[in-house]
Amino acid sequence: MLFVNADSSLQAYQGLAKTYSAIEPPTWALLLAQSCRAKDFGVAILDCDAEKLPLFEAVDRIQSVNPRLVVFVVYGQNPNSGTTGMIGAGALAKELKQQHPNLPICFVGSHTSALPMDVLQLPFVDFVLLNEGVYALHNLLLTDLRSDLGAVKGIGYKAGDSGENHRAVLNEPQGVVPQDRMDIDMPGYA
């Protein structure tokens, strides 16, 4: 699986992005990756923001990894940065889906949790993870990403055939990682 931190800086900060905008480390992508790695899932991270990758190069890099699932992690230290991050994540996911329509795309983040149905209605999004997404992602990865999705708590997905005839489904919530399991289920959090 590939975690992607898309670059929204040029759209959000325009000319200031070249020299003045900060590059935020993809903290939540790192935490999710380590959590999945601890469960023996293969993971990689592509930080388009740090590498300042143009859209076409980011698509090529994602395709070259040939991931089973692409997870766009749209979080930031500022609570509203998830919404700003949707600019770059949406543009990259749209281009990726146009070029590689069978590649499953998932979104997780503060904007996604606040407006899961809106994000799931985007034509390039196949799955959303609600809340922090840790257990939901682990359980989603235990499926074939096509069947038995109704049993995976904490996700949203598109049911039915592909294209215009699908319906968005939000499953019941999945609990967040309890404090006494942080070292086990979120290694590296502190």
Task: Tell where the protein language model's regions lie, with residue ranges.
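Acidic, low-complexity intrinsically disordered segments
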Residues: M1-A190
